[in-house]
Structures are given as C-alpha cells and as structure tokens.
C-alpha cells in the first residue's frame, strides 16, 4: 500500500437537515486512479483511509461509477470504517423499467458497498419533473417510506443538472432531505445557480456541491489571462483555493465534493477546508472573481448569461444548458462539454436537445442579450449532436420510456 503522510488538520463541519454533522469537504469517488481501466486499490485505500483520519465523513459514489461502489465497500469493510463515515450513492432511475427493478438495483448497491444501509440516497440526474412523476407512478414514495422505516435508507435527495426553474419545481415536488447540484464561481448564474442554492436553503434543504472546480477548468485549464490575474493579485492563493473559498464562504453550502485522486489534491483541499469560513471574502476579492469570470468567458461562442428569459421553449429545448455545453466545448474542454450536453438533454422522458428547435423564434423575443438563438442552436446541434450522441440519446430514451 502507498503511504501518504499528511499533517493533522482541524476539519470543519456543517449540519444536515436533522442536525448530523457533515465534513465541509466530501470525497467524490468517481475518479479514483486507474490502471488498465481498473481502480488502483492500494492508492484508493490509502487516500480514503487518510481522508477518514483527517475528518472527512461524506463519501459520494453512484451505481454507474465503474468499480467505485465495490471499491468503497471493500476498503471500508477491510479497515472497519463503516461506523465513522456516511455513504452517499445514487439510484439510476433511468435504468429502472418496473417497480421490481427498484429493489433489485438497490440490493445490488448494498451488496457492492458491503453494508445494510445507505446514509444519503439520491435520485441520480433527476433533471426534470416528468422523471420524478414517472417514479411516482412506479410507487417511489411508498418505496422510500418503506426503506426508511426499515433503516435501509436514512435520507433521500436528488442530484441535478439543468436550469434553476426546473430545479425549484423538483424541490417543491417532494419532502427532500437534501440535494446535490453543480455550483462554482463560473456557474453562479447557470445550472441551478445561486438562485437554486438559496431557494433550497430557504426550505431547510442542505445543498451538496459537485463540480466545485468545473472538472478542473478552474484549476489546470484556466486561460492565460485568468492565470495572470491570480498571479498578480496581492494575496497569493492557488486556483483551487480561490474556487473552494468562494463556495465555503456561503452559508447555503453544506458539503463540497472533490474527486481527490492524489495525495497532493487531498492535502491541498484539506488545508483549504481548515482555513475557510462563512463570510470570509472581502469586497475587493469579490471583484477578483468577477475579473476571472470575464477572462474565462472572453472566448465563449454564445454570450448567454443563463437568465432563463427564453424558457420555456415550446419544444422543450434547454437553451441555457445547450449554450453552456457549447461554450465549454469551445473552451477546449470537449470531453466534459459533451458529458454536460448529454446530462442536460438526455436521461429524461423528452429530449431537450438543440435538434428539437423548430425555429419558431419565441425565445429570441425575450432574450435580453439579443442572441440569435435559432442560428446558434443550429451550431450547437452541428457540433454536439454527433453520431455517438444520437446513439446514447436513443438508448437513454428507451430506458426512460419503459
């Protein structure tokens, strides 16, 4: 086993809906180091054990994260850590074709994780209200109640990729224990955004943050101008520190997930967590974030601010989501841009992709940025709706209809 030596830090905690303390830094378990497509178990084990020793108690995985649930189960059992940690995993509702499928899939997750209960269970990528209604028709609310009564599930939430309007609708559709959203200083006004995060907080719903550094875009993929802004600032901090401090400054944020695949990442994030506080960012530093956002967005193809005035589209196109993915593609982050586009347009009853546009022009009448939305959506379709996209979309559509 690889040995990692970290100085002890004082982990900070924030409370969930029922007063349980969760570490402000959570461990995202989707991207463990791999070799030949398989998780390198000795490295993963050392990282996870050190994380627990340093006070991290929230570990996020999912059914579709290849090998992740099984790796966590093996490591936590081997090191007798189950009582010290909280496991969050996810129901891939888009794979469920019948009520019986709920029990079958959940049982498989318990087996993989080598446990008889899940602390935080999420509806994975619950991106529109129709998907929730489909689950309701399948008896999901009764199923959740039974699992909670039996102690097999302690809290239930959902993860989300989409606009703030739909996010708020889903929040209001059920008595959720928590939620999980993509949120960072670049996405303050896209995805669920600050509006969604603040609305969840107003309802007493804890918010778990994913993509806090935009999949590395806010660290290793910053444009030169943004890197210079950071380098020239009187207070010297790493790009990761700027990104994470922005989140922990907000009282609405409960846990920030980070996929820490090395001892360096783990050590840096632990240090930042220990030094971060709510309300710590002064006005002059907020101006730096605004400068960074402008620098990052200088080369964007579409000047969409994700205000949502163009919504709803009569054909269901997620216009802000499509443009966000398109801009990310042209920011030289093509792999994650493609995944973003898949998340916001598939795995739901009706596709919300750019290809649905019929050119009615209703959206353009309401756009405060005067974007030629119809023309730009054609470019999005041409760029992102590749043969691979169409294959995945077809498969996703089959799953959610049965």
Label each PLM-derived region with a short phrase.
Residues 35-36, 49, 53, 96-213, ...:
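Glycine/proline-rich, positively charged
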Residues 23-27, 59-60, 85-89, 118-123, ...:
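Hydrophobic faces of well-ordered beta-strands that scaffold small-molecule active sites
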Residues 70-89, 141-150, 202:
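Alpha-helix-loop-beta-strand connector modules within alpha/beta enzyme cores
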Residues 91-93, 384:
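Acidic, glycine-rich active-site loops and adjacent beta-strand->loop/helix elements
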Residues 50-52, 56-57, 76, 175, ...:
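Structured C-terminal cap/extension of enzyme domains
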Residues 63, 67, 127, 161-162, ...:
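Short beta->alpha linker loops
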């Amino acid at each position: 086993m690889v040995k990692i030596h970290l100085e002890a830090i004082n982990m900070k905690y924030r409370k969930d809906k029922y007063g349980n303390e969760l570490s402000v830094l959570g461990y995202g378990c989707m991207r463990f180091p791999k070799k030949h497509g398989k998780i390198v178990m000795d490295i993963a084990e050392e990282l996870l054990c050190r994380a627990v020793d340093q006070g991290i108690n929230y570990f996020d995985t999912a059914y579709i994260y290849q090998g992740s649930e099984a790796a966590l189960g093996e490591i936590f059992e081997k090191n007798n850590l189950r009582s010290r940690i909280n496991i969050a995993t996810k129901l891939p509702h888009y794979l469920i074709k019948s009520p019986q499928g709920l029990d079958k899939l959940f049982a498989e997750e318990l087996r993989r994780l080598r446990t008889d209960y899940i602390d935080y269970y999420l509806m994975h990528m619950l991106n529109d209200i129709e998907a929730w209604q489909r689950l309701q028709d399948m008896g999901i609310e009764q199923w959740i109640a039974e699992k909670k009564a039996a102690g097999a599930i302690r809290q239930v939430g959902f993860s989300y990729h989409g606009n703030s309007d739909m996010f708020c609708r889903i929040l209001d559709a059920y008595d959720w224990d928590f939620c999980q959203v993509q949120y960072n200083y670049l996405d303050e006004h896209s995805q669920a955004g600050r509006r969604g995060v603040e609305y969840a907080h107003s309802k007493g719903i804890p918010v778990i943050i994913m993509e806090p550094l935009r999949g590395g875009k806010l660290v290793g993929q910053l444009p030169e101008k943004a890197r210079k802004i950071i380098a020239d600032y009187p207070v010297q901090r790493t790009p990761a520190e700027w990104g994470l401090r922005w989140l922990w400054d907000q009282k609405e944020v409960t846990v920030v997930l980070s996929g820490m695949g090395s001892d360096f990442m783990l050590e840096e994030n632990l240090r930042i967590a220990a030094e971060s506080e709510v309300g710590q960012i002064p006005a002059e530093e907020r101006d730096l974030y605004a400068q960074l956002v402008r620098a990052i967005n200088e080369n964007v193809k579409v000047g969409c601010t994700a205000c949502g005035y163009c919504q709803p589209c009569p054909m269901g196109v997620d216009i802000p989501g499509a443009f966000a993915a398109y801009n990310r593609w042209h920011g030289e982050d093509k792999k994650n841009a493609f995944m973003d586009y898949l998340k916001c347009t598939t795995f739901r009853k009706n596709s919300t992709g750019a290809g649905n546009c019929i050119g009615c022009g209703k959206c353009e009448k309401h756009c405060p940025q005067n974007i030629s939305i119809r023309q730009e959506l054609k470019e999005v379709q041409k760029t992102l709706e590749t043969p691979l996209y169409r294959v995945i979309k077809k498969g996703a559509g089959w799953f959610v209809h049965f």
